[in-house]
Structure formats: C-alpha cells, structure tokens
C-alpha cells in the first residue's frame, strides 16, 4: 500500500477525533471557570467566618462595625446546619458587643491603676482673703498626682477647700464671689496625673541611666502603678521636654557666647518612617570649656559642616573652636576670620600608634615628642599655674618641640607613601599642625579634645539600650534633655534635685525673660541650692 493510500484511509478518522478534542477543551474551560468561581466563593466565606470569629473572640478595642444581617446572604448555598451555626454565632457576637460597648468605654477613662499607692503628702489650699465670719466651708476638690522618690511611688493630694456664704441672704464683698475656692497650682502636664518628681525620674532613667520605657514601666508596676503604656510615658516625656525647651535655647545662646568651645559629633540611629528602618544620623556636641556648659544639637541628622557653621553664624560666634580632624570643620570655617581652629593632639597621637607595627622607629619618635608635650602640661597642672603662666611656660618649653616636629615631618614625610601607615600618620598630623600650634597662643586652650569626647560617651552607652530615636523630633528632644544633664554633671549638680525643681517651676515661666531663664540653668541654679551640689569623691 502506498503512502497516499494510507493517508486517504486515515483522514476520515481524524475528523471525529478533532471534534472530541474540541468538546473536551470546552469542558475543561467550563470546569476551570467553575473552579475559579468556587475558589472565590470559598475566600469570601472564609473572610466572613474570620470576621465573625473576631467579633466573638477577638479584641473589642478595634471598634469593628456591628454585623449587617444582610451580609449572611453569602451563606445561602451552605448546608442548613452550617448556616444555623453561623447565624447563632452572629447573634451571640452582636449581643456581647452591645453589652460590653458601654462598659469598655467607661473602663478606658483611666487605665492607670493607683489604688496600691500610699498617700504620703497632702497640700491643703484655702482661698485668699477669706473672711471666716462671712464664709463657711461647704466642701473640697481633691486632685491626685503621682510623685516619686527613690524606691517608691506615692500619691500627693492637692485639696482645695471650697467656702460659701454662711447666710444665703448675705451679699459677697465687692470683687468676691459667693463661693470661694483656691486656684489650682500649675502642673507640668495639664490635668495629668504625673507629678514633677515622676516626670524628672522618667527623664533621668532614659538619658542618665539609659533605661528604655518598657523597663521603666516594669519598675513602676513593681512599685504599685499598674497599666502604664509606652505611649503614655512617651506622651509625658514629650510634654515635659516642651517645658524645658526655653531653657535649652538660653543654654544654646550661652554656649555660643563663649570664646573657646570644643565640638564633636556622634551617630544616633533615627527611625525612617518610609523604610521602617533606623538610619544613621548625627548629633552634634558643643562645649563651652571655661564655662563648663554643654550643648547637644540635632539638625535633621546631618553631619555636613554647614550645621556647625549655621550655628556659629546664628550666634555670631567669635573665638577658638577645637575639634578633631573631621574635614567638615575646616571647610566650614577656613574663610571665617572670627573662628580660629585648634585641633586635637590625641587624634594625631592615635595615628602614630597605628603605625607602630609598620615602622616602629618613626612612630616611637613622634610618640616620644608628644609625650614630652604632655609632661609639660602635667607640670603646669601640678604647679597650679594660671592661664598666663601656662602660656609663658608653653612658649618656653613646648614651642621648640612643636617647631622641631613640624620640620621633622617636612623632611621625613616625603620619604613615605601616603598608603603606608606612617605616611598616613605624618600627612594627617602635618596638615593639622598649624592649627595644633594655636594652643600655644592662650593658656586656657587644651592640647586635646578629650573633654568633648567624654561628653559623647553617655550617648554611646544609651544607644546600646534604647537603640534608636523614633523620628527627628525625638532626636531633638533627646538633645534638650542630654544638654541639661551634661551641664549638671559638669557643675556637680544633683540632676534629680535639679529636674524636680525646674519641672515644678517651668509652668510659671512660660513668659519669662532671658535673664530669668538664665538663672534656672544648672550653673546658676546651684548658687541658690548649695544642698544639691554633690561632693566629689577621690
């Protein structure tokens, strides 16, 4: 049989097979569409069951809307027993929601439970200019606030007596009311339950002892105050910082008024709301050396030299600025005749230490000369020299060492590649040596920036505990609190005593003058509170 004959016999058989194939394809298409429809129905029913379960067993605080009975039409094709169970669950959920709605709202008015706290202090206030011959006591209004003393929380009751005319037919004296009550003392937080000592403790625990909110809340719970939340504590913190910001602005002006400051910067993680990740931002520190005032400054996390430049321009800073080798300072002030840059000998020394393994003779020579410079400083310290005497001694002994070091670097520096450790150390030191020699000009100037670095360390320690700031505003608030606490440390002021008093006073100083606020900064405040000055121990 030829090939053509075989094909002629097969062709009649192909047509029925093609028809069957087309029919099966149509069936598959219909079944696929039906399956997709059923899957969609299952998702809808699953969502409805989950919604009903949340109403019945979930948290009521989500305030979900009451179930619309019309939504149950989706269950029309279900088995009767399943539909009946869902309907019963719906009725039970609606009933429970209705019963608990009002009750829950009432309970939420004050979630913080203070019943276990003792009442240790009562302040009874009587109206001014009270004529007891005309008025009689008719009641009192009691305000309860939570105060703190180390190891204990307690209630302070502010009792305001209410007095009314003895005789209803009497007329109150001119300018007075028929019912008298003492005015409510101003509190740090309007209608808040947190007293000044509790608020100061929250600030101290967070930025002096580096304790995050959740640990504080656990501690306060152990002391008898239940139901505190991180959002509540953070709200108290923010309102307290708002009270302190006028003080912070005065402190900033006082620091920048000085003619000798040290500056440094450190990183602080700040949460980015868009990426939900903590970004590395920068916090600046400026320290007025002679006045021992400390300022932390946050400007959207920038490390650009423009930050410190704008700060100096705003307050018309004139004087010496001592800093590490960060190029941003030099860029910011190289054209400013009012700012004389002084660098840090410790940073120079560190670079030579790093070169010890590579080129010990060269590195040891540089380190030995730097050691001689510090021996001269120790000699001046031991002799208790005044700034003028120190300046004279430096010019007698230190200047020739500094000049010899510069000549040595000019001669030896060209022999080593900038890629070598010793080459890097010489380049780093030489490019900053003229600025470094300025410490010979004034006996007040220090050879290094160590004091500034010491102010940064508490920030570093805190970073390991509270981890990050929630946003830029939180970082600015941190700068406010840390500035006041650092200044307290520099003046040996008890920070708890200081904050207790200042937070109590600030509600009365919302319109205070610059000079009035200046008297509330730690270095001035301690003059009228000698009992709060801590004695240094050796």
What do the predicted segments below correspond to?
Residues 1-193, 234, 262-263, 397-398, ...:
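Short, flexible loop/hinge motifs at secondary-structure junctions
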């Amino acid at each position: 049989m030829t090939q053509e004959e075989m094909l002629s016999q097969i062709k009649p058989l192909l047509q029925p097979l093609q028809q069957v194939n087309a029919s099966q394809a149509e069936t598959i298409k219909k079944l696929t569409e039906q399956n997709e429809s059923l899957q969609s129905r299952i998702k809808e029913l699953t969502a409805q069951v989950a919604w009903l379960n949340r109403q019945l067993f979930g948290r009521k605080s989500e305030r979900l809307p009451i179930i619309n009975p019309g939504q149950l039409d989706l269950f029309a094709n279900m088995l009767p027993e399943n539909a009946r169970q869902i309907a019963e669950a719906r009725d039970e959920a609606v009933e429970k929601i209705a019963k608990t709605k009002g009750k829950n709202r009432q309970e939420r008015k004050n979630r913080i439970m203070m019943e276990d706290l003792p009442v240790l202090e009562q302040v009874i206030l009587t109206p001014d200019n009270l004529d007891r011959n005309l008025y009689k006591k008719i009641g009192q209004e009691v305000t309860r606030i939570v105060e703190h003393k180390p190891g204990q929380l307690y209630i302070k009751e502010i009792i305001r007596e209410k007095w009314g005319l003895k005789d209803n037919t009497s007329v109150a004296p001119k300018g007075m009311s028929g019912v008298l009550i003492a005015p409510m003392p101003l509190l740090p937080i309007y209608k808040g339950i947190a007293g000044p000592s509790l608020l100061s403790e929250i600030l101290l625990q967070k930025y002096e002892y580096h304790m995050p909110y959740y640990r504080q809340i656990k501690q306060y719970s152990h002391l008898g105050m239940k139901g505190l939340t991180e959002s509540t504590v953070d709200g108290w913190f923010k309102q307290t910082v708002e009270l302190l910001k006028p003080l912070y602005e005065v402190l900033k002006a006082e620091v920048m008024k000085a003619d000798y400051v040290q500056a440094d910067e450190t990183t602080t993680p700040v949460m980015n709301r868009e990426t939900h990740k903590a970004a590395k931002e920068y916090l600046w520190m400026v320290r007025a050396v002679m006045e021992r005032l400390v300022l932390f400054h946050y400007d959207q996390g920038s490390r650009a030299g423009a930050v410190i430049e704008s700060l100096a321009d705003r307050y018309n800073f004139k004087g010496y600025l001592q800093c590490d080798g960060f190029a941003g300072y030099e860029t910011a002030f190289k054209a400013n005749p009012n700012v004389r840059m002084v660098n840090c000998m410790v940073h120079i020394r560190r670079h030579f230490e790093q070169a010890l393994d590579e080129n010990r003779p060269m590195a040891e020579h540089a380190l030995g000369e730097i050691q001689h410079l510090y021996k001269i400083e120790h000699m001046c310290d031991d002799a208790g020299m005044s700034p003028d005497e120190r300046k004279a001694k430096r010019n007698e002994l230190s200047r020739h060492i500094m000049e010899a070091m510069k000549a040595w670097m000019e001669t030896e520096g060209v022999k080593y590649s900038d890629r070598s450790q010793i080459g890097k150390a010489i380049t780093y030191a030489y490019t900053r040596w003229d600025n470094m020699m300025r410490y010979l000009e004034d006996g007040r100037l220090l050879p290094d920036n160590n004091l500034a670095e010491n102010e940064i360390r508490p920030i570093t320690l805190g970073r390991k505990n509270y981890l990050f700031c929630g946003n830029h505003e939180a970082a600015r608030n941190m700068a406010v609190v840390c500035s006041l606490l650092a200044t307290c440390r520099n003046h040996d002021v008890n920070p708890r005593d200081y904050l207790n008093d200042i937070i109590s006073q600030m509600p009365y100083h919302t319109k205070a003058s610059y000079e009035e606020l200046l008297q509330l900064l730690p270095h001035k405040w301690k003059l009228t509170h000698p009992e709060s000055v801590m004695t240094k121990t050796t």
